[in-house]
């Protein structure tokens, strides 16, 4: 439906004379404390219980919406595990439809990744034991149910997963969860006038909403001590990419990507965050000034009025998070570390090259996902060169592997993209150097897929078999 001149004039009169604004626009102007998901840590001999169930959540002050979540909460607890642990998870499905779950970025064999072969019917459980052998990184877990991933993630089946190791423990960076080390889960939604999320699958492409949410609320703030603050950023949106920056122009110090620390911090004025991508940043709050992270220009009054009549993809507010320093500056403060890893990240020699094509229509290399077809067969312990092309800009993810970006449209990747990754934004062509460190099997393959969740549900998924080392 298009907005006619008559409707615009009528709505303008209503809005200006009566002060009427949509609930989401009103809520965007009210800052709320940042909700910090509870921390669930692995302990030897004790399983981690993850119950997938209905929940209630307040996306806007004074409202309460029926949603999905983990352990009775919209989004789930933050899981923290340690390298060397063998972590037993017990997933329980208390919904009325099938669900499968995965931990994106986890380096484990195919049978432990989730997917169609690990589908949980209503009232069923799945209890994998996950060997944690990878380096410190910020990962995320989410639903990956065939043909239902977009809806289920949108409903709330997602959360952050942290891997720690001796390096992350010893570095002079913030590590007190919920004090100076915060999860920041960014999503966009469309809320009705009662604060309830609306989801209508688009006819093409992926869903984009007009309401920015961080950890489930609009326009949050958090009080922090003066000094360094660590933010673990996750884009859990269905398809929207964000360009993050500080409102006062100070730099974002990037210390980590999808699969762990960069060799050294990288200071940037603007930072891209694609769907499914994770980054860690440090923010210097020692000067005592309040600062906000934003992601572009917010909707104008015309756009907001238009939102009365038709769905909008323009964000009402682009405020991600406000940091409010409190207290005095400590007598001793750590400086930004010069190095995060003792050596540079090295790459091996690829044994073969592949072309991966993501089109405007669903499918990869012209084929829709088929659970009975293996699309790529590789060998554990080897490297390959993948050239990924996309007609429509979108994020691309590979399960069970790590890769390095070698070039983007023929140019070197940005410094913040030169670490180990598993998700990349493709706008044109990117060349990846992929390392296959984990095995998979025909009945338990890895996925490689469009991270536009609706495109994946429509068939933009391939299946990867990695033959184990003999």
From Swiss-Prot:
PROSITE patterns: TAT. Keywords: Cell cycle, Cell division, Periplasm, Signal. Exported by the Tat system. The position of the signal peptide cleavage has been experimentally proven. Can also be exported by the Sec system. Disruption phenotype: Cells lacking this gene are sensitive to oxidative stress and DNA damage at high temperature. They also exhibit filamentation. One of its GO terms (biological process) is FtsZ-dependent cytokinesis. It is found in: Periplasm. GO terms for molecular function: copper ion binding; oxidoreductase activity. GO terms for cellular component: cell division site; outer membrane-bounded periplasmic space. Residues 1-27 form the signal peptide. It holds the Pfam family Cu-oxidase_2. CDD domains: CuRO_1_CueO_FtsP, CuRO_2_CueO_FtsP, CuRO_3_CueO_FtsP. Its main location: periplasm. Cell division protein that is required for growth during stress conditions. May be involved in protecting or stabilizing the divisomal assembly under conditions of stress. HAMAP family: FtsP (MF_00915). Belongs to the FtsP family. Is used as a model substrate in studies of the twin-arginine translocation (Tat) protein transport system. This is Cell division protein FtsP. It comes from Escherichia coli (strain K12). The gene is ftsP.
